[in-house]
């Protein structure tokens, strides 16, 4: 979508100061989804500047109070973060970007098969819900991720690390079915085994569950498994966001917003590069 001077004045798109700043091509992907400024009261800080500040924080993991001075005051950015978090903006942006990315790959906008996995992550002294993952020996929280066969995120949830993968499967697939009722099958690893848990997940979502097991139990460490490597790759992409190297948040709601924001940032970059290459 070409930009004109009115667009540039509206969103105050200027020359990027940091590599995380949004470009015109990236902004065009999500501009229609950004909330319109209120007509009354003081003029709010430009949404693009807030986006740049948040994406900088995701990549560099700086605390709120250490936000560089060429961004707005950290309280301004923080208040907008909470407002967008509470409105569900990032989940909406991720959903739209995933549909656009699938169509750019020549696929239908909605998937029919998904892959499920989890990632346990340590927390800090910030407090909030947490638990101990006995299998991975990690005290903190667990990120549950559902992706399509391209590795694009369909659903993500966060729980205490003590929640077993199989116990999180039913609410995950139920959310997937509510969002994308065309999904008919899912692929999971051995951590999701359990007849009772799988029956509950199928009853909640009508999505079939296939467990993909390791064929060589003698080999320790990571092994690429057919049908499951795409979700491992997506989890690897998330690790580029240093803000997500640990869970610094006091609430799961904020932790989920940062995760969704990181996914949106990755999708924006991917789509913008694809469009530039085709131009």
Feature roles, as predicted:
Residues 1-279:
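Short alpha-helical elements
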């Amino acid at each position: 979508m070409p930009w004109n001077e009115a667009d540039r004045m509206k969103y105050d798109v200027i020359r990027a100061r940091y590599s995380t700043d949004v470009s015109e091509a990236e902004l065009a992907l999500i501009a229609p989804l950004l909330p319109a400024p209120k007509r009354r009261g003081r003029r709010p800080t430009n949404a693009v500047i807030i986006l740049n500040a948040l994406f900088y924080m995701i990549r560099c993991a700086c605390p709120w109070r250490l936000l560089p001075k060429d961004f707005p005051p950290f309280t301004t950015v923080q208040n907008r973060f909470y407002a967008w978090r509470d409105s569900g903006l990032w989940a909406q942006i991720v959903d739209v970007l995933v549909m656009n990315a699938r169509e750019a790959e020549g696929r239908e906008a909605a998937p029919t098969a998904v892959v499920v996995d989890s990632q346990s992550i340590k927390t800090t002294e910030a407090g909030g819900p947490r638990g101990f993952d006995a299998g991975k020996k990690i005290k903190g929280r667990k990120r549950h991720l559902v992706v399509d066969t391209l590795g694009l995120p369909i659903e993500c949830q966060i729980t205490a690390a003590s929640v077993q993968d199989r116990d999180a499967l039913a609410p995950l697939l139920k959310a997937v079915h509510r969002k994308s009722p065309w999904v008919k099958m899912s692929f999971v690893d051995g951590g999701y085994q359990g007849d009772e848990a799988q029956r509950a997940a199928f009853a909640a979502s009508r999505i079939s569950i296939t467990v993909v097991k390791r064929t060589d139990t003698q080999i320790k460490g990571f092994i690429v498994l057919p049908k499951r490597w795409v979700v491992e790759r997506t989890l690897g992409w998330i690790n580029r966001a240093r803000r997500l190297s640990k869970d610094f948040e006091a609430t799961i709601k904020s932790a989920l917003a940062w995760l969704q924001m990181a996914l949106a940032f990755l999708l924006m970059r991917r789509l913008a590069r694809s469009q530039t290459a085709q131009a």
